[in-house]
Amino acid sequence: MVVDLKMLAMIFIINFAYITLNTIRFMLTMKGYRVIAPLVSMAEITIYVLGLSMVLNRLDNPLNLLVYALGYAVGISVGIKIEDYLALGYIMVSVILPSTTEQFHLPETLREHGYGVTQSVAYGREGERMVLEILSPRKNERTLYKLINQLEPRAFIISYEPKFISGGFWTKKVRKRNDAISH
């Protein structure tokens, strides 16, 4: 059995590119990017057909299939990293604080850092709690978690991605606040 390194490299690169695009396209679709997702899918399917035909025409070499699978796995990993880097969309973070009196400074500190914070009082098994609702661009997600944990390490944090946002804090003022923070 002759090993064609050029062919193996082409199979890997093609499937790597296909799966990376597939992962990104899927995430764009889930975020509602209705124009760019179909455009990415056109490139994705073209690359897919090319790579698949290369492997199917050379099934006599099991190494081709192995490299195809390796390109698939690496493509998923890289696609996820790219999506994390792009950090499309927003997150909604709910923060439950141990008490309302000790942590009164936390909402104001978060606001000073440019976050929109809605606070309310809730009652848990051990009494009164302060609950914060924070909407943030995903690009700021890790920074927000670090800030909350620095200010209150006992905070209980839950985050999720909202499907629809309308009105409230998220107006043109957000850009102004972000610009002020970064300068």
UniProtKB/Swiss-Prot annotation:
Claim: Lipid metabolism is one of the keywords in the record: no
Keyword annotations of the record: Cell membrane, Membrane, Transmembrane, Transmembrane helix
Localization terms from the record: Cell membrane
Predominant location: membrane
Membrane topology label: Multi-pass membrane protein
Bilayer-crossing regions: 1-21, 35-55, 62-82
InterPro entries: DUF2179 (IPR019264), DUF5698 (IPR044035), UPF0316 (IPR022930)
Domain of life of the organism encoding this protein: Bacteria
Family: Belongs to the UPF0316 family.
Name of the protein in its database record: UPF0316 protein EF_1609
Organism: Enterococcus faecalis (strain ATCC 700802 / V583)
Upper classification of the organism: Bacteria, Bacillati, Bacillota, Bacilli, Lactobacillales
